[in-house]
């Protein structure tokens, strides 16, 4: 703009009629505050990153993090410097305005000059005001030049103060597509896991099928064998088998009865043989049998202690097995009498199925000739 072409009324009016330097001062303070905050943030972030990467977190990941944050730190530093420069430029503009305002002719003086010129011109009838009119015009010219000079200086200072560093947006310290890549990776991992699970299910199914295929011949053979057994059991053969079983049961019963009889015979033979001289037993053997429902003493065996009955050797216990019947005593209910003996008569101890003479009435009926005969009862098979 050509401020020299404008009269002082315009320039002075513009300078005095504007907003002044208050807005520039407020802008400078705001930019200064931004510069301080951004600078503090840059210092704090840099300190934290340095302490973290050198004291607590070290390694490739730490270096990668520091490298990713470094552009952001540079941006913070540049922004703080630009804000400080803007604040300084705003202050310079305010100072330039103040200078221009001080150099600008007040509009009141310009108006007064113009009023004086008009009065001098009106009263200059005889030319007496020519010098005053010239002085007034000269003063007005000075005002013109002064306002123009002030405006040019202000315009130049404002142009310098308006040169600011362009502000930029911070660069991304992370990959903007990272979330998408993470979601894709998660989906791929899930698909892979599902595929592995399906593959495992197929593998288990194949193994089961293989096992069943291997077991099929064995199962078929087992089924065939079971079917043969079932058919065999459905024939008349089981009748023969049942008859054989019954026959075997009879043989077992016979063997059991024979063993019982042989046991009784062995007991009796052992008793008699133990009393004979030179018996086969080298040590005394005691054997007791208590038949159910029959009174008497137990069956015993001993070596070298036999009693004598006539010409026979009998066990010593026979002499006390049963009380002897008095000599010449008549038996109840009979006409027989017991012959007199030199000593007590020993009798055979009670055996199964036998009755002791002293405990039975009429059991010894009949003639007596020396030793009382021994009667073995007949035992049935078990």
UniProtKB/Swiss-Prot annotation:
InterPro entries: PPE_C, PPE_dom, PPE_sf. One of its GO terms (biological process) is response to host immune response. The keyword Secreted applies. SUPFAM superfamilies: PE/PPE dimer-like. It is found in: Secreted, Cell wall; Cell surface. Expressed and presented to the immune system throughout the different stages of the infection, which makes PPE44 a very promising antigen candidate to be included in tuberculosis subunit vaccines. The immunodominant T-cell epitope p1L (amino acids 1-20) could be useful in the design of anti-tuberculosis vaccines and in the immunological diagnosis of M.tuberculosis infection. The recombinant HspX-PPE44-EsxV fusion protein induces strong immune responses and is a potential tuberculosis vaccine candidate. Signal peptide: none annotated. Transmembrane segments: none annotated. GO terms for cellular component: cell surface. The keyword Oxidoreductase does not apply. Keywords: Cell wall, Secreted, Virulence. It holds the Pfam family PPE-SVP. Belongs to the mycobacterial PPE family. Virulence factor that modulates host innate immune response. Induces the production of the pro-inflammatory cytokines IL-6 and IL-12p40 in macrophages via NF-kappa-B, ERK1/2 and p38 signaling axis. Can enhance M.smegmatis survival within macrophages and under stresses such as H(2)O(2), SDS, diamide exposure and low pH condition. Promotes the death of macrophage by apoptosis in the later stage of infection. This is PPE family protein PPE44. It comes from Mycobacterium tuberculosis (strain ATCC 25618 / H37Rv).
């Amino acid at each position: 703009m050509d401020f020299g072409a404008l009269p002082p009324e315009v320039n002075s009016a513009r300078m005095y009629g504007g907003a002044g330097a208050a807005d520039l001062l407020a802008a400078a303070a705001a930019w200064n505050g931004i510069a301080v905050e951004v600078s503090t943030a840059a210092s704090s972030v840099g300190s934290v990153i340095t302490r973290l990467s050198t004291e607590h977190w070290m390694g490739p990941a730490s270096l990668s993090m520091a490298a990713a944050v470094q552009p952001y730190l540079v941006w913070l530093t540049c922004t703080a410097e630009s804000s400080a420069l803007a604040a300084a430029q705003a202050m310079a503009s305010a100072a330039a305005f103040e200078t221009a305002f001080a150099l600008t002719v007040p509009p009141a003086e310009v108006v007064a000059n113009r009023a004086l010129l008009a009065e001098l011109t009106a009263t200059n009838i005889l030319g007496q005001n020519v010098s005053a009119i010239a002085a007034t015009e000269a003063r007005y010219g000075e005002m013109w030049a002064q306002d123009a000079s002030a405006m040019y200086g202000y315009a130049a200072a404002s142009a310098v103060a308006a040169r600011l560093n362009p502000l930029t947006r911070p660069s991304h310290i992370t990959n903007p597509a990272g979330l998408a890549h993470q979601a894709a990776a998660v989906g791929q991992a899930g698909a892979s896991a599902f595929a592995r699970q399906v593959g495992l299910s197929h593998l288990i199914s194949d193994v089961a099928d293989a096992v069943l295929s291997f077991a099929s011949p064995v199962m078929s053979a087992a089924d065939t064998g079971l079917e043969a057994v079932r058919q065999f059991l459905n024939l008349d053969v089981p009748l023969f088998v049942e008859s054989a079983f019954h026959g075997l049961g009879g043989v077992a019963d016979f063997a059991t009865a024979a063993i019982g009889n042989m046991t009784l015979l062995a007991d009796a033979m052992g008793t008699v043989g133990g009393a004979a001289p030179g018996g086969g037993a080298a040590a005394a053997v005691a054997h007791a049998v208590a038949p159910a429902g029959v009174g008497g003493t137990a069956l015993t065996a001993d070596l070298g202690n036999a009693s004598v009955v006539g010409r026979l050797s009998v066990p010593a216990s026979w002499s006390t097995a049963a009380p002897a019947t008095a000599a010449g005593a008549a038996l109840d209910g009979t006409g027989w009498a017991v012959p007199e003996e030199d000593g007590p008569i020993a009798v055979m101890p009670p055996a199964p199925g036998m009755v002791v003479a002293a405990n039975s009435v009429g059991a010894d009926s009949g003639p007596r000739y020396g030793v009382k005969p021994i009667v073995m009862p007949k035992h049935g098979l078990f």
